[in-house]
């Protein structure tokens, strides 16, 4: 009997000893891996190589344009590689977005500049772009990664107050409100957007508010509602040149309709700053870009941004061309020559990218120019 118990004890203890040794070995291996990871390159090194200097940009010999009929995607050039988002302010904003069930176009549209805008950069203006009326759009533009549906969920009646409450706690200098298209609503959601603006201004009258809004299918009553809501900047994107509009944008969006919306917004409120944005790299020509810029100026648009189109998923339009930083610099200079209050042009520039910094810097520069001109006239 005792012999059987000793044998059983031996059989029980043996697996325990083996398991303990295995656990010890695994722990040592895990510690070794952690040490190697700590000393080696991290994930951010793979996302952005610190050696990607301007000389590397200039010496880049990769293919920048896809030929007609060519299916293979272009390789991403070095000037389009960005850092992953980090920082306390970034984490704070993201956490509150989740808590208050708010959406941002920064996340939904997979913007590459989210960390820089939310964090404010080293000396920059903190900017966030909140997407109102949910995360589902009634339109299906071929460049956009936002979800689509014919009848999205109903509006959240608490969203205007929740949005204003969050913004007041962040201490932002500049807020951009954008929205999905809501063709399923009689007013396209214009009253909802206007109410949000008023709630924000009630809590902080000094914050700059920009609204990047839909075309409301050309309904000028909706445009007037937004224009007189108390916002500072009325933005509506033309997106691309006239020839490519039917191919790039939803069939309900029209090039001339966009120009009319921008023109009428200024008429309803002459004190507004109006703004629009153009994506490059979809196959447009220089002549077509020039024509679009002139059309925007004729419509009274004050500010324009130009940025590189980047394909969000395999289901979206392919990039035809990666435009060089030098070419973007050319369009910035050309925009200034045409009389825009400011032109933000660069590969990673988006409609609301560092909107506050570009806007405020431009305003200050223009004030300084006027001051210098006044001093010269007195001499």
Curated annotation (Swiss-Prot):
Positions bound to [4Fe-4S] cluster 2: 137, 141, 144
Binding residues for [4Fe-4S] cluster 1: 106, 111, 117, 352
Domain Radical SAM core: 122-341
Signal peptide: none
Keywords in alphabetical order: 4Fe-4S, Iron, Iron-sulfur, Metal-binding, Mitochondrion, S-adenosyl-L-methionine, Transferase
The protein's enzyme class: transferase
Alphabetical list of CDD domains matching this protein: Radical_SAM (cd01335)
Chief localisation class: mitochondrion
Cofactor info, note text: Binds 2 [4Fe-4S] clusters per subunit. One cluster is coordinated with 3 cysteines and an exchangeable S-adenosyl-L-methionine.
Name of the featured protein: Lipoyl synthase 1, mitochondrial
Species of the source: Drosophila yakuba
Gene responsible for this protein: Las1
